[in-house]
Curated annotation (Swiss-Prot):
Segments of this protein annotated with the region Disordered: 1-68
Gene (name only): wtf2
Any Gene Ontology CC annotation: vacuolar membrane
Protein name: Meiotic drive suppressor wtf2
InterPro entries the record matches: WTF
């Protein structure tokens, strides 16, 4: 009996099988030689090779988003608390020196203490919230300040002269306002005087003579304005013919 077996493959499929051994895919390029003896190598363009060479996932491309942000916040909080801590240490040392640290405190003293704690808390919140802004500003200011180091001796001498001229009125505050009120006024004016001295030192270091020059210019401008007001002549007096 004859076998009437008929192939189900069409002529197009047979032509495709013949072409696969000789034709080159233009997108993938020529196929490299594949060594079947090496178990680690895989035939190119296989599904397993595609999976092994898959691109990085979103988490691998963005590892920073999956990290914890608690540590930077604690660092910001610690750095923001540092200037407040230094200021409080200076105030405590001054009170200890005058033997007035939590001694004989009345209602007024405790009110001032509570107000001071509130100011420190608000300052800590403000410095933590605007951490990037004030740290960048301080960094730029320090760099600009250090570039003017040659002006520091002159600025220091001016601050020293400023302390001598204003020192005697400061010492008389205790005697003018009495022992009890003199302590409060002495502490307030001491802090104010220290801040003013620091500002004068910074201003004279960054721009030498800025305070003196601006003060002299302002006084000269005001004097010139006063002279012009008193010596100004109306237009009618200068041109009497215009009235006729």
């Amino acid at each position: 009996m004859k076998n009437n077996y008929t192939s189900l493959k069409s002529s197009i499929d047979e032509e495709g099988e013949l072409k696969t051994d000789h034709e080159i895919d233009l997108e993938k390029g020529p196929l490299p030689e594949y060594d079947s003896e090496e178990e680690s190598t895989l035939p190119p363009y296989s599904d397993h090779a595609r999976l092994s060479n898959s691109p990085n996932t979103h988490r691998e491309n963005n590892p920073s988003r999956s990290t914890d942000n608690s540590s930077p916040f604690l660092i910001k909080l610690l750095i923001s608390f540092t200037p407040i801590y230094v200021l409080n240490v200076l105030a405590i040392c001054y009170l200890k020196y005058n033997d007035a640290f939590f001694k004989n405190y009345g209602a007024a003293e405790w009110t001032l203490f509570g107000f001071w704690c509130l100011v420190c808390t608000l300052a800590l919140i403000f410095l933590t919230y605007f951490y990037e802004t004030w740290t960048k500003a301080v960094g730029k200011g320090i760099k600009h300040f250090l570039k003017k180091w040659e002006n520091m001796p002159m600025a220091f001498s001016e601050v020293f002269l400023f302390n001598i001229l204003v020192g005697s009125p400061r010492m008389n505050l205790r005697y003018i306002f009495g022992d009890r009120w003199g302590l409060k006024w002495s502490l307030a004016e001491h802090i104010t005087f220290v801040v003013l001295s620091i500002l004068v030192f910074i201003a004279e270091t960054v721009k030498p003579g800025s305070i003196r020059v601006n003060l002299i210019r302002k006084m000269g401008y005001e004097a010139k304005q006063q002279v012009n007001e008193y010596t100004a002549v109306p237009l009618r007096e200068m041109n009497p013919e215009s009235e006729a």
